[in-house]
Amino acid sequence: MHLRLISWFFIILNFMEYIGSQNASRGRRQRRMHPNVSQGCQGGCATCSDYNGCLSCKPKLFFVLERIGMKQIGVCLSSCPSGYYGTRYPDINKCTKCKADCDTCFNKNFCTKCKSGFYLHLGKCLDNCPEGLEANNHTMECVSIVHCEASEWSPWSPCTKKGKTCGFKRGTETRVREIIQHPSAKGNLCPPTSEARKCTVQRKKCPKGERGRKGRERKRKKPNKEESKDAIPDNKGLEPSRETPEQRENKQQQKKRKVQDKQQKSVSVSTVH
């Protein structure tokens, strides 16, 4: 009798546990399927589902759909990720994807950074920059063409020749200018920064230490008057140079001719008397 009562007690207890577990699982399924229930939602979701993720977000958060394979999952973020722009509505804050050629954007019509191979100009991404602009490959933007700018010419330098300013008549003078703005890739090239031209000066003697090389050489070549007198050879007191046999024979013949001429003159005088 006691054994029969105990067995019935365990049967009834197991049946009650089974009914309770069924009611609990039914309640969990109902809560997951109900769209207004937020129990168990993670990451700032106000409402969610196991299959689609977040369905709505808490205040100030942005709702964005992320693609995972063939499936899109709702996510709530404090700011929109790169490639999306945020728009706030009364009932939801939403992230929308930028255009295909845009990396980051302010809204659907204004890009702030283009993807590789495109140049940014006035909020749009272009393959080539418009006329009058050039592409900056560093910033990937269309920028204005910059031409070279140079300063005014300096005054002409003193007339010089081989670094000297005296001791000559013709020399060279120069002037220079500086580059203020270097050109961009398509800008006009810079002009020459120096010029030189021939010049003439009034002849003037150089101070000591500035005389040119030619002037010093000329001074060395000009002898003094006393030195020139001393340089004249004095033949007095010099021994006569030795004569060659031919010179002696010529002198003897000249003497004979003179003697013969005198004899002829004397004979002619005697015949006249």
UniProtKB/Swiss-Prot annotation:
Residues 213-223 have a biased composition (Basic residues). GO terms for cellular component: extracellular space. Disulfide bonds join 41-48, 45-54, 57-76, 80-95, 98-105, 102-111, 114-125, 129-142, 148-190, 159-166, 199-206. One of its GO terms (biological process) is positive regulation of non-canonical Wnt signaling pathway. Gene3D superfamilies: Hormone Receptor, Insulin-like Growth Factor Receptor 1, Chain A, domain 2, Thrombospondin type-1 (TSP1) repeat. Residues 201-273 are annotated as: Disordered. GO terms for molecular function: frizzled binding; heparin binding. The keyword Disulfide bond applies. It comes from the Eukaryota. Glycans are attached at residue 36. Residues 224-252 have a biased composition (Basic and acidic residues). Keywords: Disulfide bond, Glycoprotein, Heparin-binding, Repeat, Secreted, Sensory transduction, Signal, Wnt signaling pathway. InterPro entries: Furin_repeat, Growth_fac_rcpt_cys_sf, R-spondin, Rspo_Fu-CRD_dom, TSP1_rpt, TSP1_rpt_sf, TSP1_spondin_dom. FU repeats lie at residues 35-86, 92-135. Residues 147-207 form the TSP type-1 domain. It is found in: Secreted. The keyword Glycoprotein applies. Residues 1-21 form the signal peptide. Activator of the canonical Wnt signaling pathway by acting as a ligand for LGR4-6 receptors, which acts as a key regulator of angiogenesis. Upon binding to LGR4-6 (LGR4, LGR5 or LGR6), LGR4-6 associate with phosphorylated LRP6 and frizzled receptors that are activated by extracellular Wnt receptors, triggering the canonical Wnt signaling pathway to increase expression of target genes. Also regulates the canonical Wnt/beta-catenin-dependent pathway and non-canonical Wnt signaling by acting as an inhibitor of ZNRF3, an important regulator of the Wnt signaling pathway. PANTHER family: NEUROHYPOPHYSIAL HORMONES, N-TERMINAL DOMAIN CONTAINING PROTEIN (PTHR46987), R-SPONDIN-3 (PTHR46987:SF1). Interacts with the extracellular domain of FZD8 and LRP6. It however does not form a ternary complex with FZD8 and LRP6. Interacts with WNT1. Binds heparin. Interacts with LGR4, LGR5 and LGR6. The FU repeats are required for activation and stabilization of beta-catenin. Belongs to the R-spondin family. This is R-spondin-3.
